[in-house]
Amino acid sequence: MTTTSTTTTNTTNGQFCSDESLEERRKRFLLEVDAKHERAHDKDDATKRFQYLLGLSALFRKFINLNASKDPAFKKRIREIDSKTSFKESSKKAKNSRRRKTEKEEDAELLQDEEHQDDEDHQHTVMTESPSYIKEGKLREYQIQGLNWLISLYENRLSGILADEMGLGKTLQTISFLGYLRYIKHIDGPFIVIVPKSTLDNWRREFAKWTPDVNVVVLQGDKEQRASIIKDQLYTAKFDVLITSFEMILREKSALQKFRWEYIVVDEAHRIKNEDSSLSKIIRLFYSRNRLLITGTPLQNNLHELWALLNFLLPDVFGDSDQFDEAFDNQNSEELDEEEKQRRQDKAVSELHQLLSPFLLRRVKADVEKSLLPKIETNVYIGMTDMQVEWYKRLLEKDIDAVNGVVGKREGKTRLLNIVMQLRKCCNHPYLFDGAEPGPPYTTDEHLVYNSGKMIILDKMLKKFKAEGSRVLIFSQMSRVLDILEDYCYFRDYEYCRIDGSTSHEDRIEAIDEYNAPDSEKFIFLLTTRAGGLGINLTSADIVILYDSDWNPQADLQAMDRAHRIGQKKQVKVFRFVTEKAIEEKVLERAAQKLRLDQLVIQQGRQMNSNNNVGNSKDDLIGMIQHGAKEVFENSKGTMLDDDVEEILKRGAEKTAELNNKFNKLGLDDIQNFTSDASAYEWNGQDFTKKGNNASLGLNWINPSKRVRKELTYSVDNYYKDVLKQPAVVKEKVVKQPVVKPKAPKSYNVQDHQFFADELVTLLEREQLAFKKEISYQYSVDDFGDSDEEFLEQDDEDDMTRDEKRKIAQEKINNAVALTEEEIATRDRLLEESFHNWSRRDFTNFIHATAKYGRNEYKKIAKALGNKKRSEIERYSKMFWQNYQKIEGYEKYLSQIEAVEKKREKLINQQKLLAKKIESLQDPLEDLKIQYPPNNSKRVYSKTEDKFLLYCVHKYGLSTENLYDKIKDEILTSDIFKFDWYIRSRTPQEIGRRISTLLLAITREMEGPLHGKKRKAMGESNNSSRFGSVEPSSINGEKHSPEVIDNEQTVKKLKL
C-alpha cells in the first residue's frame, strides 16, 4: 500500500507520547542488558530486510547464504523467508503460463492483503512537497527526492550512504528525515549524530533553524562538563538528538553504548573505512536499529574499503570481505582475448552497481542544480627557475643511490618519501629550504617572485584576475608556502585572508565573514588544502588556484567545492599548478589514475582521505623521483617561460585535455593493471629494468663508482644504530657476549626563538662530543662534501681541504672531556631556564597573540596558545623583548606586532574622543552634532541613526567583542526604530563600516583638519581597509557608496 504524504500538519508540536512518564521514556532510551542481547530481538527487522534484498537480485543471496552457512539460527530465518515467498513464486509461474487464477489462489492473496493492509510495514510514504515541519524555508525538488529515498530505506529496514556531492544539502536532508521519524512516525529518539569536531556547532545551528522543536544536546567539553551532560541530560532521557564528535565517541564509549539508538548518523563517514580502527570498532559495538553514513566521497580506491562501509551498514549481509573481493576480482584473465575481457569487465561493473543501488544515493551539482555552471579545470604547466634547478639537482645528488633505486628493504620507502617531499618543496619555492633566501637583511621584494616559476606565473595571473574583477582562492598543502604568499600579498598590496591548520575556530569564522562581505575589499583567500577544504562556503570567489596538488585527489576536489557550490553566480575556473619535467607531473598522473578508478567503480564517485596504494610502492616512488631528473642534470639553467599568460593558459588547457583523454580511454582492468604492473623504470619509451645496473637510468647521470658515497642520514636513531654496529670480522663461532651500549645524550635542535644560553649550547656540544669519543666515532672525508673542489666552492671562508677539516673535527672528539657533576647541574638549570619545548608554531602563535591582545596581556596570550601557562608566557615574553634581536628576521615579527598596536592605539584614541564629545552632552541622542564631510550630502543613514550608533559605541566600548552584533540587537529592540526598515535590515558588517566612517568624522572634527595630513605624511591612509573604510550602502539589492545614491532613492528610504 502506498500513501502520498504532504505533511501539512504539525499539531503535536514535538510532544509525543504525552501519557509517557519520564521513567517510561528513560526505559525506552536505555538498553536493558547490552547491544548483543537487544539485537536478538530484532528478528522482524532482519526478516524484512533480507526479504527485500533477496527480491532485488540473486547477487545478494550469494552473500546471505554465506552467512547462513555459518549460523544455524540465521539459516533457519532464511528458510522461513523462502517458504513465505514460495507462494508468490508459484503465482509468478502461473502468470508465465498464462492461465487464470483458481479461486483458492485468489482467496489466499486477498486474505494476505487484508491481513496486512493496516500493517505499518506495508505502507510506503512518498513526499510530494517540502514537509511543513521544516521551518525557515523549503526543500528543493532533489532534496525531497533524497528525503523519499531515506524514508524508503527506513521502511525496508536498510541502512544507507547519502553521498551527494558537497554543497547539495546533505545536512538538511538528514534533518528532514529525522523530522519525518519525529513528526510522522512519532519516533522522537534517541538519535545520535557523530560529526567532525569542527562542524559540531554547525549541526546544532542547522537543527535549530530547520526543526526548532527538536531537543538537541551537544556532548563536548572537558571531563567534568561531559560527566554533567551525561548524568543530567542523557541518562535522564532529556534529549531527542545527541550531537557529538569522533573524539568524544572514543572517550565516552562506555556511556554511549548503553543507549537504544534509533539511528546512528555518521558525517564524513570515510573515518570508519578501516574496520580495524578504534573508532570503527567502537561504533560497531553500539546498538542501533539503522545507520546512515553521510559523505561526499563514498567509494575508496579499492573494493575492500567499500566492503568496510557496507559491512558497517549491514554486517549480517556483508560479513566476509574475501568473498566480496573475489566476486569482483577481474584481473585473472590473461588468457582471454580483449573482447572477452571487456565483456567480463562490463559485467563486473554492472553487478557492482546492482549491489550498491539499494544503499547508495549519489547526485552531483551538474545534474540537480541547473543554474550552477560547470567548473573549468586547467592544469598550468610551469618551468623552473635557475635557482630551483640548482636546488633540485642538489636534492637528487644528496642521495643518488636512492634515486637510482639502490635502497634497503626497511628504510627504503621512508628514504624515497623524504626525497619526494623535498623535491615537491623545491617545485613550490626554493625559499622553503633554510638558507636559500638571500639575507640577512631579509627583504620583501621582487626576488620572492623571480626565484620561483610558480610565483612568476601566479604574479601574471593575479594581475589579470584583478583587472577582470575576479576574486581568488589559493590552496597549498604547505602552510609555509602560505607564509611566502602572505609576504607576496603584502608586497603587491593585495588585500587577503588566511586559514591554515593552526587557525582557531573563531578566527576562521571571522575571516570567512570578512571575505564574503558584500563589498569586501579582500582579493585573495589563502588556505591550506586540508584545513580549508571542509565546512567553508566561499562562493564570493570565482577563481581557484591549486598551488600544489594533494596526494589524495579528493582533497583537491573538496577545495574546489569551496567556490563551486550552490550560491555561485559565476563560472568557476580552477587552475592547478604543475611543474614541468619534474616530480609533480607524476603526482598529477597518479591523481588522474585514482579518479578514473573511482569513476569506473561507481558513476562519478568521490572519496576523501583515500589511503590506497596507488603510486605509493617503492617502484612508483622511484619513477616519480626519476621523472625529469635527466633534464635537470643536463641543463644547469632554468626553463622559465616568458610567454604571455594567455598563451600559457592555452597550452595548459591543451595538455589537460590530452591527460584526461589518456585516462578516459582506460577500462577497469587497464587501470588496475596500470596501478600494479606499470614499471617505474619505463622512461622515454625504454624499459631500463632489463639492463644491468651500470646501464640504469640513474647511473647515466653521474658516476658514483669512482668513490664509495657515505649514506647521509638525519635520523639520530639510525645514525647510532650504524655507529654501534659490531664489525663482522671473526668468522669462527664465538659465544656472543651482551654488548652494553652507552646511552646517547638527548639531542636538541637549537632554534633561535628558544633562547638557549651560549653556555648551554657549549655544554650540549661538549656532551655530544664526549659521547662520540666514548663510542670511538670517526669522521670520514665524505662527511665534508663530495670532492675538494666542490667543498672549496661551497665554503670560501678558508682554503682548507676536506681532510684538514676532518682532522680538526676529529681532534675535537679526541680531546672531548665528559661533563662534571657540577656542569651537568648547570646544564639542567639552563635547560629549565630555556624554552626548548617551544616549537616554531608556538612562537608564531605567540607573535600573533601578542599583536592581537597586547604585549602585557599574558592571560589572554596563554589562552590563545592553549598549551602554555600564564607564568611561562610572562617569562617568555620578557625574554623575547630583551633578546628579540637574536631571532633571524625579527624585523618582520616586530612590524607585525607594531602594526596591530597602531590599530589598537587608533581605536583607543577614537574611544577617548567619542567619550569626550558624548559626555559633554546632557542628552547625546538629541544634542549630539556630527560634522559630516562636504561630499556626504546624499548620505543614506539619518542623523538619528548615526547618533544612536555612536551612542551605542560609547556605551559598549570599541574593544568589546562582537560589538556590532550587540549594536544590531540594540537596534532591533529599540522603540526608536520600530518601523525603520532600513536600519533594522542592516547587517553587523554594514553597521561596523558605518561606525568606522562616523568615527573618522569625529576624529577629524576633534583633532582638526591638519590631522589627516599628518597621518598621510606618516604613511597612514585614511581609507585603509585595516583602519576604517567608507561605508557602501545597499538599496533594493544594489550596492552604492554614499556619494552616488540619487535623491529619488533617498526619498524612497525616508518614506519607508
UniProtKB/Swiss-Prot annotation:
Ranges of residues in domain SANT: 833-885
Where is there biased composition of kind Acidic residues? 105-118
Q: Where is this motif: DEAH box?
A: 267-270
Question: Polar residues bias located where?
Answer: 1020-1036
> Where are the annotated segments for Disordered?
85-130, 1010-1056
Question: Where ATP is bound, by residue?
Answer: D164, E165, M166, G167, L168, G169, K170, T171
Q: Which GO terms describe its biological process?
A: cellular response to copper ion; cellular response to pheromone; chlamydospore formation; filamentous growth; negative regulation of antisense RNA transcription; negative regulation of transcription by RNA polymerase II; positive regulation of filamentous growth of a population of unicellular organisms in response to biotic stimulus; positive regulation of transcription by RNA polymerase II
First-tier enzyme category under EC: hydrolase
EC no.? Answer: 3.6.4.-
Q: Primary place of residence?
A: nucleus
- A Pfam cross-reference name: HAND
* Domain of life where this protein originates: Eukaryota
This protein's GO CC annotations: CHRAC; chromatin; chromosome, telomeric region; nuclear microtubule; nucleus
PROSITE patterns on file: HELICASE_ATP_BIND_1, HELICASE_CTER, SANT
Domain Helicase ATP-binding residues, every copy = 151-316
Q: Which residues form the Helicase C-terminal domain?
A: 457-608
The free-text function statement in the UniProt record for this protein reads: Catalytic component of the ISW2 complex, which acts in remodeling the chromatin by catalyzing an ATP-dependent alteration in the structure of nucleosomal DNA. The ISW2 complex is involved in coordinating transcriptional repression and in inheritance of telomeric silencing. ISW2 is required for chlamydospore formation, distinctive morphological feature of the fungal pathogen C.albicans that can be induced to form in oxygen-limited environments and has been reported in clinical specimens.
Name the UniProt record assigns to this protein? ISWI chromatin-remodeling complex ATPase ISW2
The record lists the organism as Candida albicans (strain SC5314 / ATCC MYA-2876)
Q: What is the lineage of its organism?
A: Eukaryota, Fungi, Dikarya, Ascomycota, Saccharomycotina
